[in-house]
Design a protein with these regions (language model features):
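Thiolate-centered catalytic microenvironments shared by cysteine-dependent enzyme domains
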Residues: 114-209, 213, 234, 243, ...
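Positively charged, proline/Ser/Thr-rich regional signature most characteristic
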Residues: 54-132, 140-145, 213-283
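Bacterial N-terminal signal peptides
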Residues: 26-41
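Signal peptide processing junction and immediate N-terminal pro/mature segment
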Residues: 38-51
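Bacterial N-terminal signal peptides that target proteins for export
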Residues: 6-30
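C-terminal soluble interaction/assembly domains
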Residues: 282-334
Length: 346
């Protein structure tokens, strides 16, 4: 609510009654409180939505540069998601804890499937995290597809209830390019936490919810895959059929990146790119999906966390989950076309 100046009430006579000094002082104090409240409210509405580091004046996220990460206090928990992060003698950021991306994913037959909640809880507790722990997620940063790993884990942790999250933009590639310190010494295991999940299901789109919203103009189903997957010319190995969700529109997650770069560009650039999003009249919610919720996590992260688009959810199982359920699909090639595609791939 904005504060608005109101004219003083009209005097009841040509010469209004004189007020005591105490009365005038009370009115001045009341006016001061009102102006302070207005300024506070306006300041809150204009404040950036970065996460804070509890106990300090520093803020970070949802993206953080290598240089900024190097200045943060040691209480910030750095999670290394690289496949070889847990291997012996692997160079890493000092203080980083190894939790390879595969630890956060489903089985190879359906990688996008959410783990059972007790497994997520045990993993978060092992890393010593709770809902107030500031967390920075680090991947290799080699290419745009790699960004899906920290984006998916960021989404997972936010869904589980963690509040202070950031991704190292450009990952280890950016850290090494900045000539920042590395170590091969293993990080001591933290004291396990007593973390209890506080699920935010507004971030999650389940298969049944997607099925319910098919054809509904208020929900934009956004396919984050390359065009060939969207058109049914290619399919993920774990998917039972090629194609996409009925009524879906496509926006390849690669659009957010400069060619060959694993780091997101400036917010102003992302805003210009977002202006190219496909439009669906009446849509108030976006459901981001791909093959296994990996590329889709990048679209979700940029739209929801960086550009602050409201009502963006992720379908974690995506097309692998959907196609195996024998649910309706669009752009499904004929059997002959599928055989031809298989032959050409040999």
């Amino acid at each position: 609510m904005r504060c608005m100046n109101t004219p003083p009430p009209a005097p009841s006579s040509l010469h209004p009654p004189r007020r005591s000094a105490w009365s005038r002082l009370c009115r001045i104090c009341a006016l001061g409180w009102l102006l302070a409240a207005c300024a506070l409210q306006q300041g809150v509405s204009a404040a950036p939505s970065a996460s804070s580091v509890p106990g300090t004046a520093q803020t970070f996220g949802p993206l953080i540069s290598a240089q900024a990460l190097a200045t943060l206090p040691t209480q910030v928990r750095i999670i290394d998601l690289r496949d070889d992060a847990a291997a012996a003698n692997v160079a890493h950021i000092p203080g980083a804890l190894a939790a390879p991306y595969a630890d956060w994913r489903g089985p190879s037959s359906n990688p996008g499937q959410l783990l059972p909640l007790p497994r997520f809880t045990a993993l978060v507790r092992r890393l010593g995290l709770n809902t107030e722990t500031p967390v920075v997620l680090v991947a290799s940063g080699d290419d745009p597809s790699d960004f899906g790993a920290p984006a998916r884990v960021y989404w997972t942790l936010k869904w589980l209830g963690l509040k202070h999250l950031a991704i190292l933009n450009g990952g280890m590639t950016a850290w090494q390019a900045a000539a920042l310190p590395l170590t091969r010494q293993p990080t001591p295991a933290p004291t396990p936490s007593a973390f209890t999940p506080q699920l935010d299901d507004a971030l999650l789109a389940t298969r049944s919810e997607v099925a319910r919203d098919l054809g509904h103009p208020s929900t934009l189903l956004l396919d984050a895959r390359p065009k060939a997957f969207y058109l049914g010319r290619e399919k993920a190995p774990a998917a039972s059929r090629p194609g996409t969700l009925p009524g879906a529109l496509d926006f390849d997650n690669l659009h957010w990146f400069e060619p060959g770069s694993g780091a997101l560009p400036a917010v102003s650039t992302l805003q210009r790119i977002a202006a190219q999003l496909p439009q669906q009249p009446g849509a108030v919610q976006i459901v981001s999906f791909c093959n296994t919720g990996h590329w889709a996590a990048t679209n979700w992260f940029v739209l929801s966390e960086v550009l602050h688009r409201p009502h963006v959810a992720l379908y974690p199982g995506s097309m692998v989950d959907w196609s195996r359920a024998d649910a309706p699909m669009a752009h499904v090639p004929t059997r002959w076309q599928q055989l031809e595609q298989t032959w050409q791939a040999l």
